[in-house]
């Protein structure tokens, strides 16, 4: 059987993504209390889209300059250049269509997932929300089977190990589950769909552009219930700007873009396992920044989750 290589560069990019997201749970907890869940998510996604606009223009300019230099050094005939130009035009239209479909699909998934998560965080702790969100490590490979995406025994073992960690953290008093936990569990399913949608589109389109479109779609869709249900006032933002800016610039603009780039040509189950480290980081961030209790049980869970990640990185 041919061994499956896991790109180290992609793994490190996704690890950085998980770190930013883990800290963002603190920002979501603080910001959501100040302005409302929908208002918080709408604002941070629109900020994320806005941040990526100059980045896209800069990358386009650099690519255009590089392409121009290549053309000037070439010696192709006029006939060949015309034929190439026609093919490029057709390909460009197809790429644009794929980009728009991918961006809108990701935006809808992100809108539903992030809003269920934000609402859930209002009724449960930052650390618990982080771990329940990480249930996508189980959902992704199961859904992937229907898409003919197979996983090695090492990866399945890592999923089981991570699931044990989630059980140790979340199920403390029997099998009862609170309102906030249920909302975040729905969010985990939706993030699983989001990961698989990215897995499908990321090799085909520009990751930064697709990320920008998804934020714009998510921000606009979330703004509708924010305006109708929460009636946001500018004065309410005064105590939440720090959290909103971190969530908008880092969690959205930087981290979600890194996710799209990092997931390119990567097994979605391995990607989900790396991203699930956000749960461990969210517990530590809640402990350090918010002063929330960090129990011995939660420390053990962090170790178990890290062991699952290491297991998933072994040569397949």
Question: What is the meaning of each model-derived region?
Answer:
Residues 2-4, 45, 53, 57-61, ...:
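C-terminal-most transmembrane helix of multi-pass membrane proteins
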Residues 6-11, 34-38, 42, 94-99, ...:
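Juxtamembrane helix-entry segments on the extracytoplasmic side of multipass membrane proteins
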Residues 15-23, 27, 55, 101-123, ...:
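Hydrophobic alpha-helical transmembrane segments of multi-pass membrane transport proteins
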Residues 31, 40, 44, 120, ...:
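Hydrophobic/aromatic residues within transmembrane alpha-helices
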Residues 38, 52, 139-141, 176-230, ...:
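Transmembrane alpha-helical segments that form core, pore/gating elements
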Residues 39-50, 118-149, 187, 268-287:
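Specific alpha-helical transmembrane segments that line the substrate/conduction pathway
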Residues 52, 151-171, 191, 222, ...:
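Hydrophobic transmembrane alpha-helices of multi-pass small-molecule transport proteins
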Residues 99-104, 151-162, 181-184, 205-215:
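Cytoplasmic-side transmembrane-helix entry/capping segments in multi-pass membrane proteins
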């Amino acid at each position: 059987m041919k061994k499956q290589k896991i790109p180290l560069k992609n793994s490190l990019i996704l690890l950085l993504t998980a770190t930013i997201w883990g800290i963002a749970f603190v920002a979501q907890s603080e910001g959501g209390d100040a302005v409302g869940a929908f208002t918080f998510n709408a604002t941070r996604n629109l900020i994320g889209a806005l941040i990526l606009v100059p980045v896209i223009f800069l990358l386009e300019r650099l690519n255009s300059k590089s392409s121009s230099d290549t053309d000037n050094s070439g010696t192709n005939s006029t006939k060949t250049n015309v034929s190439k130009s026609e093919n490029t035009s057709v390909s460009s239209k197809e790429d644009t269509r794929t980009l728009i479909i991918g961006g809108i699909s990701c935006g809808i998934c992100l809108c539903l997932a992030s809003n269920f998560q934000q609402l859930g965080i209002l009724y449960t702790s930052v650390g618990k929300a982080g771990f329940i969100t990480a249930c996508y490590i189980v959902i992704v490979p199961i859904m992937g089977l229907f898409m003919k995406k197979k996983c090695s025994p090492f990866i399945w073992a890592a999923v089981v190990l991570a699931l044990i960690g989630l059980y140790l953290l979340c199920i403390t008093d029997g099998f009862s589950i609170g309102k906030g936990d249920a909302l975040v569990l729905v969010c985990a399913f939706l993030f699983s769909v989001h990961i698989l949608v990215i897995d499908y589109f990321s090799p085909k389109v520009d990751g930064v552009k697709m990320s920008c479109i998804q934020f714009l779609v998510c921000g606009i869709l979330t703004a509708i219930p924010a305006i109708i249900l929460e009636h946001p006032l500018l004065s309410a933002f005064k105590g939440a700007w720090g959290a909103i800016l971190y969530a908008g610039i880092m969690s959205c603009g930087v981290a979600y873009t890194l996710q799209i780039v990092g997931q390119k040509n990567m097994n979605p189950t391995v990607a989900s396992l790396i991203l699930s480290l956000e749960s461990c980081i969210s517990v530590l961030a809640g402990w350090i920044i918010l002063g929330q209790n960090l129990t011995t049980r939660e420390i053990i869970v962090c170790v178990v989750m890290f062991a699952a990640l290491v297991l998933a990185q072994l040569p397949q």
